[in-house]
UniProtKB/Swiss-Prot annotation:
It holds the Pfam family GATase. Allosterically activated by GTP, when glutamine is the substrate; GTP has no effect on the reaction when ammonia is the substrate. The allosteric effector GTP functions by stabilizing the protein conformation that binds the tetrahedral intermediate(s) formed during glutamine hydrolysis. Inhibited by the product CTP, via allosteric rather than competitive inhibition. ATP binds at S14, L15, G16, K17, G18, I19, D71. L-glutamine binds at Y54, G354, L382, G383, M384, Q385, E405, R462. It comes from the Bacteria. One of its GO terms (cellular component) is cytosol. This is CTP synthase. It catalyses: UTP + L-glutamine + ATP + H2O = CTP + L-glutamate + ADP + phosphate + 2 H(+); L-glutamine + H2O = L-glutamate + NH4(+); UTP + NH4(+) + ATP = CTP + ADP + phosphate + 2 H(+). Homotetramer. Gene3D superfamilies: 3.40.50.880, P-loop containing nucleotide triphosphate hydrolases.
Length: 535
């Protein structure tokens, strides 16, 4: 029978529930179990697709095209699994489904209420996640903080699940904070006690408490937490600050978290073999080289907006024993006069995805500098589009060339709406989303990277290269090295007479793994290292 683990958070947000859940998932997978994982977000948006990155950080896209919380990126990278649309559920999605059922008459004229209709729909999403993936264990992270009004239906639903499937098949893990008061020189357990009290008032008794702390906690303090929260002292797990996120699974294993879980859920499985993971952590902590990548974007004040890009760069760096230093550059501040100073000492330049006109001219200026100065360049999504616009303007001489998204009246719409997007009015969930095939041109840098004729990558875009300009650009030396199998859509562009200048319409950052870097990121970092004469 499928087992269910629920991870909740208390005291404050951003305690690392997602990393805790991901790390546990990795440990259980390495015990030979089939694990899936999901995130419940209490906000009323249907998904984060239309939310500002400043509000929510990166939007992570799954193979089946779901626009999801950035925690799913952590889940995929840690556990090395591909998730689906059932892995991220929001209040908005739940209510939308229930209201559609009510309009269809599915409730036979009954009064639709939070209990049982909303809670039943939430429970259905938990059970469906396990059924769709044939999982031995489903890990569900509940977003927000215990005590928030928005989280109550989710907490009630996971309380009911224990009755539905039996206490031996459900486990509750609560993440809390033990703050250190510098003035008093003391750590305080009272916030944790009150958070657990709040959780218990809702009918949920945690089986494990993961204590987030910046200072080591004593056994006496663990015993105190265990006494007041009514759990075994061995079930108080310390989660201190880590040098690298990837060491956290090993820290949790050392404290026996996975053994506690297997014992409680009566899972008969082998010990987790973490030797490969230990080698990864050893490598990460002992990198001997450094490469600097200038990341030119519009949301650089919030690095979480590009978290998968940065992690993918790091994964690529690990393959070459290199520590990646990201130089954050606000695209709005880039001009012809200062671009050289801004990207000074950068071994490579990366322009990531984005929407809207803010910072676009700065990105175009950056691309021009990378092209002319022969600096390794990697463009992603909008990064590919601005690379195409820059070439049209400055090599073909098409003055005023632009994207129809930014300048609808441009005489040369190098980037235009996808044909199927012409009559769409809604912004949410209407992009070209998810995994699509890309056919590569033999002999190209893209082909060298993938060593494959057809590859599959995840997309999130509405605009595409305009084929009216394809022949003209090709004749001027622009290489279309990746297209959809029918040749209709441009997926990858590159330049011949350049050390490494490649840009993709898709988002390769969503498929990178710490032990298996994504091919284009790997070759971009390799080219950056070679250029800096560090390899």
């Amino acid at each position: 029978m499928t087992k269910y683990i629920f991870v909740t958070g208390g005291v404050v947000s951003s305690l690392g529930k997602g990393i805790t859940a991901s790390s546990l998932g990795r440990l259980l997978k390495n015990r030979g179990l089939n694990v899936t994982i999901q995130k419940f977000d209490p906000y009323i948006n249907v998904d984060p697709g239309t939310m500002s990155p400043y509000q929510h950080g990166e939007v992570f896209v799954t193979d089946d095209g779901a626009e999801t919380d950035l925690d799913l990126g952590h889940y995929e990278r840690f556990i090395d699994i591909n998730l689906n649309k059932y892995s991220n559920v929001t209040t908005g999605k739940i209510y939308s489904t229930v209201l559609k059922k009510e309009r269809r008459g599915d409730y036979l004229g009954g009064t639709v209420q939070v209990i049982p209709h909303i809670t039943n729909e939430i429970k259905d999403r938990v059970f469906r996640a396990g059924k769709e993936t044939h999982a031995d264990v489903v890990i569900t992270e509940i977003g927000g903080t215990v005590g928030d009004i928005e989280s109550l239906p989710f907490l009630e639903a996971i309380r009911q699940i224990k009755s539905d499937v039996g206490r031996d098949n459900v486990m509750y893990i609560h993440c809390t904070l033990v703050p250190y008061l510098k003035a008093a020189g003391e750590m305080k357990t009272k916030p944790t006690q009150h958070s657990v009290k709040e959780l218990r008032s809702l009918g949920i008794q945690p089986n494990v408490i993961v204590v987030r702390t910046e200072m080591p906690i004593s056994q006496d303090m663990k015993d105190k937490i265990a006494l007041f929260c009514d759990i075994d002292p061995k079930a108080v797990i310390e989660a201190g600050d880590a040098d690298t996120l990837y060491s956290i699974p090993l820290d949790l294993q050392k404290q026996g978290l996975d053994s506690l879980v297997c014992s409680h859920l009566k899972l008969d499985c082998r010990e987790a073999d973490m030797e490969e993971w230990k080698e990864l952590v050893k490598k990460v902590k002992n990198l001997s080289k450094t490469v600097t990548i200038a990341l030119v974007g519009k949301y650089v004040e919030l690095p979480d907006a590009y978290i998968s890009v940065v992690e993918s760069l790091r994964h690529a760096g690990y393959a070459f024993d290199a520590d990646i230093q990201v130089k954050w550059i606000n695209a709005e501040e880039v001009t012809e006069d200062n671009v050289a100073d801004l990207v000074q000492n950068a071994d490579g330049i990366l322009v990531p995805g984005g929407f809207g006109d803010r910072g676009v001219e700065g990105k175009i200026t950056t691309v021009k500098y990378a092209r002319e100065q022969k600096i390794p360049f990697f463009g992603i999504c909008l990064g590919m589009q601005v690379a195409s616009i820059e070439y049209a303007r400055n090599v073909l001489g098409l003055e005023g060339a632009h994207s129809a998204e930014i300048d609808p009246s441009t005489p040369y719409p190098i980037i235009d709406l996808l044909p199927e997007q012409k009559d769409i009015e809604d912004l949410g969930g209407t992009l070209r989303l998810g995994l699509y095939p890309c056919k590569l041109q033999e002999g190209s840098k893209a082909y060298q990277a993938y060593e494959n004729e057809v590859v599959y990558e995840r997309h999130r875009h509405r605009y595409e290269f305009n084929n009216e300009f394809r022949q003209q650009m090709e004749e001027a030396g622009f290489v279309f090295s990746g297209t959809s199998p029918d040749g209709r859509l441009v997926e990858i562009i590159e330049l011949k007479d350049h050390p490494w200048f490649v840009a993709s319409q898709f988002h390769p950052e969503f498929t990178s793994r710490p032990t298996r870097p994504q091919a284009l990121f790997r070759d971009f970092v390799h080219a950056s290292l070679k250029t800096s004469e560090k390899l």
